[in-house]
């Protein structure tokens, strides 16, 4: 488990992280969402031990990360900008990583290069942005570390390669102790892969929750209730996060159990009612607006 304990990081007068508190459980995929400048990259660098926080600390399985090689051996950090030696090939980077990470699997790396169609002898600097990202991810996977910190991993990948990387992550979780932490400015990028999602804004985590719990607890309903008084009663009786109306069609996002929500709607004798699936984006918009934030100005 990664424990982030009241972490504050400053750059001069700028407070990039402000008392961040979070827990990242083992064998889950943690998504860290937020706009550019929200503090995602800084937080990943603090977790990896690249940056030292002014206050607080990060622990990996109970071990403080800062200046602790034993803790750092448990993780690998993939930055948002791919970093390779000048004129390096994938083979050369493989040999370098093998020295740094004792558990690096060279044979697996060679196999994955072939699967992804990457020439091991071609200079990486001649690769496209997406191809460089692929090499970075494959190197990170093959370190066999327990934790993989990924900063904008899917940025620059086409849809096919994005799905291939997601499948690779899922395979690793099934076959060994593996916990990826994926930072992204796009909720859509992480919705279909992450188990747990945290929203970072202005250096602090607004909230962090299991994705399944969010979707079980919040519902989107569209209904037509001919009696205006009963419609008003419905809005008062439910925990409404958002509502809008077009003509006679009422759209409501509410918190509560699906059975209870359905029961209250049917009591109002609707002409039509339907519970619709919610996207992660819609859930976050509803949650943050209740907290006093306009997420439309924070993300997307």
List the predicted regions and their residue ranges.
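ABC transporter nucleotide-binding domains
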Residues: 2-4, 9-195, 199-201, 207
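Short, flexible helix/strand-to-coil boundary loops that buttress conserved ligand/catalytic motifs
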Residues: 69, 215-218, 235, 265, ...
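Short loop/turn segments at beta->alpha junctions
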Residues: 89, 210, 276-279
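Short, surface-exposed beta-strand/loop "edge" segments at domain boundaries and coil↔beta transitions
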Residues: 148-149, 153, 228-231, 259-262
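ABC transporter nucleotide-binding domain
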Residues: 165-256
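C-terminal coupling/interaction segments
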Residues: 253-300
């Amino acid at each position: 488990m990664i424990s982030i304990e009241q972490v504050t990081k400053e750059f001069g007068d700028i407070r990039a992280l402000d008392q961040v508190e979070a827990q990242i459980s083992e064998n889950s995929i943690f998504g860290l969402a937020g706009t550019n400048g929200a503090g995602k990259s800084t937080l990943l660098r603090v977790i990896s031990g690249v940056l030292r926080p002014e206050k607080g600390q990060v622990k990996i399985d109970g071990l403080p990360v800062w200046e602790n090689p034993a803790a750092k051996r448990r993780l690998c950090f993939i930055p948002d900008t791919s970093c390779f030696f000048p004129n390096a090939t994938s083979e050369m980077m493989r040999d370098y990583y093998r020295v740094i990470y004792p558990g690096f699997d060279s044979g697996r790396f060679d196999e994955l290069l072939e699967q992804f169609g990457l020439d091991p002898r071609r200079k990486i600097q001649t690769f496209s942005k997406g191809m460089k990202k692929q090499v970075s991810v494959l190197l990170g996977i093959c370190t066999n570390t327990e934790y993989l910190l990924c900063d904008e991993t899917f940025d620059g990948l086409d849809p096919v390669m994005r799905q291939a990387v997601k499948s690779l992550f899922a395979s690793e979780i099934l076959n060994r102790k593996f916990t990826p932490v994926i930072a992204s400015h796009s909720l859509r990028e992480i919705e279909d892969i992450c188990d747990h999602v945290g929203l970072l804004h202005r250096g602090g985590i607004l909230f962090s929750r299991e994705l399944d719990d969010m979707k079980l607890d919040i519902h989107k309903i569209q209904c037509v209730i001919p009696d205006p008084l009963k419609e008003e009663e419905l809005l008062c009786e439910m925990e409404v996060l958002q509502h809008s109306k077009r003509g006679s069609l009422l759209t409501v996002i509410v918190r509560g159990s699906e059975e209870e929500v359905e029961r209250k709607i049917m009591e109002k004798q609707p002409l039509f009612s339907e519970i619709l699936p919610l996207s992660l984006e819609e859930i976050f918009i509803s949650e943050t607006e209740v907290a006093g934030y306009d997420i439309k100005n924070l993300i997307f």
